[in-house]
């Protein structure tokens, strides 16, 4: 359960104080489908334009037109890439009926990021073979829900729609997806129950015998592994030159002794492993300036009534709730400075949690962060973000498995404003700290990523060997 998902859930449940006057694109599109109407052409055009500007595989010119009950999104230079978004309301065609649960505002003019996932659901068999039943459009506002969560939600919708088509017509459905901006991720991260969209067939008037579950055709993207199986080094090199930006990761495992030493050092320095790693990453992220912005995302499990043992803290990018800015010039010079920064990070996060200002700070802090990006304060290099989960929460981490925090696609990192991003995850398993440095290649080169990972780990090891200042009370 990602912090962004829980935050979206709480925003949806929140009081009128946190209510937003406008709905996000996903809500608008869902409501349009429920009403049997087309999503607004202007909304789709803005969303597709956001995607196109950030994806080198798509042409930078798009045209959105409405023709009767069909909405067409066309690449002006290639008619074969046209995507038709249509709504059917005839007696024989199933229609989507869903309960949207994301309700927030977005402002693309201020830098808020929209993405689009389009899937075509068609029947196979009988008189309707090859005929498109409907097309599902998911428009994501990145400020409230990350790309992995949205793709997973989209997949959940597809599975349910496939079951509905099978139950209604008795035909085995086949799901074909045209993903405009990102490949599907292999790892399934179930969203919370509140995010499961409830879909029903409006035309169904009587109960039918239960049918076995139908698995839609998997959506796969050709990756480097598929390329390697087809030929030698020359083929791989040629294919690599043509590959779009793709997610890669560097894994670093500390020894059990180093892990214990780090935890002990953090306690002596009155901070946490989360904050120490965040500080080390900020010190070594080359953004071309001493000004770094670190945003804090807090898992809201205790706010939604889940056991306290499942609580974990996070420091992240736009799936965060509060933004804090630090001058890392002094911290980069000495280990004492890095510990000072770690204490500042911890204090800010704890204050954000315990003061009850979390949601208010989210609404105001992200807007300020977007303005900082637009003002160019973070341009000129690589800006590092850190997402930390489950350190010291091994019982919960083991329920998910050690690979849950390392094997997922981080391709959306190339689209974040302010320059390329690192995504750092940290987990403990059997008393050993596992660090994963995710990045997008070639947006960030392999050499630069390796230098960043080595420097961050080196800073942590140097911090371990530094005694705390006199008079500091351990936490």
Q: Which residue ranges define each predicted feature?
A:
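Active-site beta-strand termini and strand-to-loop segments that position acidic
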Residues: 74-76, 119-122, 427-429
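Hydrophobic/aromatic-lined pockets within catalytic cores
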Residues: 145, 158-166, 267, 281-289, ...
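Gly/Ser/Thr-rich phosphate-binding loops and adjoining beta-strand/alpha-helix segments
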Residues: 22-43, 110-137, 232-303, 432-436
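Generic recognition of stable, solvent-exposed alpha-helical segments in well-folded globular domains
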Residues: 43, 148-152, 257, 261, ...
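Acyl-thioester-dependent acyl-group transfer interface
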Residues: 1-69, 79-80, 86-115, 143, ...
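Short hydrophobic alpha-helical segments that form membrane-spanning helices or hydrophobic packing faces
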Residues: 61-64, 150, 154, 275-282
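Non-catalytic, low-complexity flexible loops and terminal extensions
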Residues: 2-16, 144-264, 459, 463-475
């Amino acid at each position: 359960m990602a912090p962004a998902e829980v935050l979206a859930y709480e925003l949806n449940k929140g009081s009128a104080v946190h209510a937003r006057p406008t709905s996000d694109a996903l809500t608008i599109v869902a409501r349009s489908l429920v009403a049997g109407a087309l999503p607004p052409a202007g909304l789709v055009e803005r969303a597709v334009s956001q995607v196109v500007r950030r994806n080198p595989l798509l042409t930078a010119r798009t045209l959105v037109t409405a023709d009767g009950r069909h909405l067409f999104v066309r690449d002006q230079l290639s008619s074969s890439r046209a995507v038709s978004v249509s709504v059917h309301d005839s007696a024989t065609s199933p229609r989507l009926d869903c309960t949207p649960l994301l309700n927030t505002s977005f402002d693309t003019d201020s830098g808020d990021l929209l993405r689009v996932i389009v899937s075509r659901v068609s029947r196979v068999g009988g008189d309707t073979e090859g005929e498109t039943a409907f097309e599902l459009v998911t428009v994501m506002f990145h400020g409230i829900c990350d790309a992995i969560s949205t793709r997973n939600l989209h997949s959940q919708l597809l599975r349910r729609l496939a079951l509905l088509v099978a139950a209604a017509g008795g035909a085995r459905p086949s799901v074909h997806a045209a993903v405009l901006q990102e490949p599907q991720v292999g790892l399934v991260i179930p969203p919370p129950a509140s995010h499961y969209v409830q879909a029903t067939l409006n035309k169904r008037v009587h109960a039918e015998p239960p049918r076995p579950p139908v698995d839609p055709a998997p959506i796969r993207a050709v990756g480097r592994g598929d390329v390697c199986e087809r030929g030698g080094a020359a083929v791989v090199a040629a294919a690599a030159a043509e590959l779009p930006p793709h997610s890669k990761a560097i894994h670093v495992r500390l020894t059990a002794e180093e892990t214990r030493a780090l935890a002990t050092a953090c306690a002596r320095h009155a901070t946490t492993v989360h904050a120490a790693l965040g500080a080390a990453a900020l010190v070594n992220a080359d953004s071309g300036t001493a000004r770094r912005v670190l945003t804090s995302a807090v898992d809201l499990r205790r706010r939604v009534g889940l056991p306290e043992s499942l609580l974990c803290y996070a420091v992240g990018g736009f799936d965060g709730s509060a933004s804090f800015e630090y001058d890392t010039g002094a911290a980069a010079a000495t280990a004492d400075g890095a510990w000072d920064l770690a204490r500042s990070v911890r204090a800010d996060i704890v204050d954000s949690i315990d003061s009850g200002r979390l949601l208010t700070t989210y609404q105001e802090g992200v807007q300020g962060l977007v303005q900082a990006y637009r003002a160019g304060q973070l341009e000129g290099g690589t800006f590092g973000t850190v997402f930390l989960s489950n350190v010291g929460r091994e019982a919960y981490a083991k329920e998910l498995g050690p690979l849950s925090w390392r094997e997922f696609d981080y391709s959306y990192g190339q689209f974040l404003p302010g320059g390329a991003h690192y995504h750092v995850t940290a987990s403990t398993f059997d008393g050993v700290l596992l660090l994963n440095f995710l990045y997008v290649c070639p947006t960030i080169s392999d050499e630069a990523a390796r230098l960043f990972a080595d420097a961050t780990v080196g800073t942590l090891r140097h911090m371990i060997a530094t005694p705390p200042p006199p008079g500091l009370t351990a936490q």
